[in-house]
Amino acid sequence: MTDFEKTYQNYNPRQAALDEARALLTEAAKAAMADGTLPEAELPAFIVEIPADVKNGDIASNLAMAGARTWRKAPKMIADALIAHLPSIEGSVFSKVEVAGPGFINLFLSQSFWAGVVLGACANKEYGRTDHGKGAKYNVEFVSANPTGPMHMGNARGGALGDCLAAVLDWAGYDVTREFYINDAGNQIQKFGKSLAVRYLQQFCGEEAYPLPAECYQGGDIKVLAGEFAEIHGDAYVAPCKGMSEEELFASEAFETLKNALVDYALPKNIAALQRDLGKYRIDYDVWFHESTLHESGAVKAVVDKLLELGACYKAEDGAVMYRSAQYAAKYGTVNKKKTEDGTEEEAKDEVLVRANGIPTYFAADIAYYWDKRHRAENSADVAIYMLGADHHGYIGRMMAMCAAFGDEPGKNMQILIGQLVNVMKDGKPVRMSKRAGNVVTIDDLVSVVGVDAARYSLARSDYNQNFDIDLALLASHTNDNPVYYVQYAHARSKNVDRNAAAAGISYEGADLALLDTEADGEVLAALAQFPSVLATAADDRQPHKVARYLEELAATYHKWYNVERVVPMALTDPETRGDDEARKALEIAKNPEPARAAARLKLNDAVQQVIANGLDLLGVTAPEKM
């Protein structure tokens, strides 16, 4: 990396300007108090922000109004005093400072600042990356679909947003681990095995002889797996299961043997399919964690013993280990309340961690898993983020309570994000696409219809906390109404500008970035300056969809700029030369730039290109060179 490139490493122009404005105003206030212009007092809390209206400067502050009570003067007088005591702004990122209205202080950024934005984006291929997170270790667990069947649209949405959140946290300066928790133990696997075993017996004896219980998995994928197993092993497992009632069958050793054999066959295939589909979906996990290892290693028993030691659990008379859910319920929300027949909620009750027969519940494994994330030998997490589906609301309270029982801080060391439902629509109607999985629309279905780019972008641009309808017809369209097309087209357009500029012999040589002085230039520059802060905010708020929304705003600004200004000079038409002098001059600047301005615009074009490419990469979406 060159010294020039190092200058723009972890460069956040917007935050740097806000910090400098705060420092200048703080210094001015201290100077005004030191010479008696303002009475000595503790500096009041004040705001430094980007104003909504560009007429109010690039940065605005309410220090004068916030200090009216402190300094016992009118805000306008305070503002004038502060400006009079400002250190010289020569050599700073500001060109002028003004007082507006009742006492707002407005600061205007210098042309050298805006030049730095362009230079930073062009010089640093990772413009937008900062050290905001200071290397704190974050574990982001997302998707974690049960390996008992295909992944559905909720998993697709969780995958798009989870992977983007992990990428945004990484770029915001956090040390991130992407993790998938494989639920390969417990009741779900027992139900999976039972479903497979019944479907296997049906292969030879028919559905009437062995009807599939309602609580079993009904999807066509179960039939396929059972059929494959039957082709390999024939009817070897059928005879030992005959001649029993349903109750006797399900309790028999023969049925247990069949279940285990089917799970041993089908589970690895399903896990491999999960990994394959997520790979096609461009998600690359750092850790695939098997729930079964928690039981095999003794981690579940160890964590239950620890909770007993901490007093968060106790042993009931029947020998079961009970978790003190009731005492945590009020503080951390619903833990295990249930609706009664009249619609009211029962009081929270303590929960079973280990049954009287010594078998732990799934919650015990969840506790052991959290403990492992926080204390594992490699990549232990300062913060464990769980991205869960809409059916997990009741999970939050018990997990937060467990976090507190370990002495951790709920909401800080453990953070749980709940995603809402997603519906696939076409022509305003719900779509059923999958033959293999019954009524489930799978990730593979979606990708096969609209492609990875459209699937990931559309699902990543929506707030995780809101229900979302995905429109297949819109995603397949090549129109500006399709958000992924709109953003990708901006990138492709910028590449076309590069090709046309090269053909015309235009390069960066001789670029005068001070000539990026039109209104359209200013709008693009302001948008570019926001990118690192957008990523930091998206990381802090755990709202990765903000990246997509920002890209759409940047693309709109760029398309507007592209339609107004030219990099490759174009002579004015005869009618355009007949306007008044001011209009003709504006058109000349826009359409027929001098070499220094054309070169500067090429740099601005390429800065936009880099930011869009970076943003799309964070979303797991490609940045095409042509469209």
Annotated model-derived regions:
Residues 2-115, 123, 129-627:
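Non-catalytic interaction-recognition regions
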